[in-house]
Amino acid sequence: QAREALRGKWPMAAVAALIYSAIAGGLSAIPVIGGLCSLFVGLPVAYGFTIVMLGVCRGKDIDFGVLFEGFQDYGRIFVTMLLQAVYTILWSLLLVIPGIIKSYSYAMTSFILKDEPEMKNNAAIEKSMAMMEGNKMKLFMLDLSFIGWAILCIFTLGIGLLFLQPYVAISRAAFYEDLKAQQGGSVEVNVEVNVEI
């Protein structure tokens, strides 16, 4: 499903990943204030990249302007993304495994923020937790299916990540779409992922 959505859009998707990675990497490299810049600018851009790929999953063309959509509703997006990060870190302080589990519980938050503009902060995070109840392992296995490609990307000096990153993001968007479609009934997920590039 993700590969089909990317048909004819691979180059543009790679450019979107490059822009996102350049912003994230560039901000973190700024001396002294890099951490703060990554926080206040990086979180909305990370949201924007996720939403760009959600659009591709829904058959839309890639619009680089959407990368910066998080700044149009900055307070809601930033605070929610920050809370998500803080909660994950706090759980990770207890043990690594609880932190990983919680990160999967919160994985649908960005999509929910996009589709439900009236929802914010803990409400969006809690809805993600409800959607992921019983589905965290499925998403983990989906992510795990890309490990081989991630290892191969090491031998391309990271260039392959420009193609893998959108593929993973769109696969997660497809996972969300399937979950959302089943909200009225079973929460079983049936997302077929082919990691052949």
Regions found by a protein language model. Name each.
Residues Q1-I197:
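Hydrophobic alpha-helical membrane segments
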